[in-house]
Amino acid sequence: MALLRGFLVCSLLLLSCICKEALGTRLLGGLENASPEEPGVARALQFAMNEYNRGSNDMYSSRVSEVVEAQKQIVSGIKYYFTVKIGRTVCRKGATDLENCAFHNAPKLAQTMTCTFEVYNIPWRNFISLEKSSCT
């Protein structure tokens, strides 16, 4: 019995060392940097921009000109945190392909802002929500 208990303790110790090594210093549930090219990250940012444009009173659509920071956090779904620079495009609202819309360059029409977005996604429930949005 003592031998079995000792084996179990050693096994648990070994397993915890392996898990710590595999996870590194990253905390479970903690924020981690994310690549804007990851499909889930790109979809979340696209959703945030669609919501931003829908809620904006501007007659022109805006789009991301630079991703300053993208992070994600595993919770009871995935939370995405973005800091982006956005600019006003020459395309009016309702345009479907904003990626091909040029930015305004006329001083009176050009407008750039830095925005932060928080998007909450539960993929297995087909749920996505813009939790926070702020632009300056």
From Swiss-Prot:
Signal peptide location: 1-24
Principal subcellular localization: secreted
Disulfide linkage: 91-101, 115-135
GO annotations of cellular component type: cytoplasm; extracellular space; vesicle
Compartments, record wording: Secreted
Motif Secondary area of contact positions after renumbering to this chain: 73-77
Keywords attached to this entry: Disulfide bond, Protease inhibitor, Secreted, Signal, Thiol protease inhibitor
Protein name, UniProt field: Cystatin-2
Organism: Crotalus adamanteus
